[in-house]
């Protein structure tokens, strides 16, 4: 498999803490001793980030899944915000929608936002939303892969021209509460809507994967990215 293009730039996860804990933006040290909700695998980005901040993710905090969030059809954002409000967790690691629900509801505040530089600089390139496919698909159906890249780029451009389109699409996939928020979530992130995959990202992602024990070695940019489609970015 190879990465074909980016859906957006940077690690798209936020650390949201209970509002009554009064943790300041960027104060990672204040997270010590807290119970933090995070989905399996997704938690790896948080663990690596905490290590960069000098916090032991196994000894200094308790990171575990939020009960009820792994059930199909359940909204992570709504469930996580409710768990935060009920005091079942002290903080959670979520994408933009999950964070927005908690902040808008008044139960949470953002502490870490790697995409905007609130966190270790290296964490920006730990992960990134991408379109990936198999080498077989690339070899046998390159026109289909190219069409998918063009479609992604067109959507990114369309969102920048008219962010209200996000609400129209959101109605088909999100509960009413999230649908009402999606346009403002997308609008805030429009500067990151770029299909390019950079060598800096691949270098950072490789280092992250090695640190997390997910791989060994240091594959090159060409080993990781299907560069024949880069002219479409």
Predicted stretch roles:
Residues 209-233:
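Conserved C-terminal helix/tail region of periplasmic/extracytoplasmic solute-binding proteins
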Residues 51, 56-58, 108, 176-178, ...:
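Short coil/loop linkers at secondary-structure junctions
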Residues 72-172:
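Pocket-lining segment of extracytoplasmic ligand-binding domains
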Residues 1-76, 90-96:
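Short, glycine-/small- and polar/acidic-enriched structural segments
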């Amino acid at each position: 498999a190879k990465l074909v293009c980016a859906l957006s730039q940077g690690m798209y996860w936020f650390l949201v803490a209970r509002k009554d804990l009064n943790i300041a933006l960027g104060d990672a040290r204040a997270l010590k001793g807290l119970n933090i909700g995070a989905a399996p695998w997704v938690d790896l980005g948080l663990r690596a980030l905490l290590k960069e901040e000098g916090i032991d993710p196994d000894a200094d905090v308790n990171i575990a899944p939020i009960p009820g969030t792994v059930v199909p059809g359940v909204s992570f954002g709504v469930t996580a915000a409710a768990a935060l409000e009920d005091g079942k967790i002290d903080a959670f690691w979520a994408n933009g929608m999950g964070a927005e629900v908690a902040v808008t509801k008044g139960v949470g505040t953002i502490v870490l936002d790697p995409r905007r530089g609130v966190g270790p600089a290296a964490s920006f390139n730990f992960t990134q939303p991408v379109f990936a496919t198999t080498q077989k698909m690339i070899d046998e159906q390159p026109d289909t892969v190219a069409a998918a890249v063009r479609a992604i780029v067109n959507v990114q451009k369309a969102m920048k021209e008219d962010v209200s389109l996000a609400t129209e699409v959101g109605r088909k996939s999100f509960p009413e509460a999230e649908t009402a928020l999606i346009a403002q979530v997308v609008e805030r992130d429009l500067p990151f809507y770029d299909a390019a995959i950079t060598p800096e990202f691949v270098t950072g992602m490789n280092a992250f994967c090695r640190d997390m024990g997910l791989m060994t070695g240091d594959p090159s940019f060409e080993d990781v990215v299907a560069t024949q489609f880069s002219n479409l970015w």
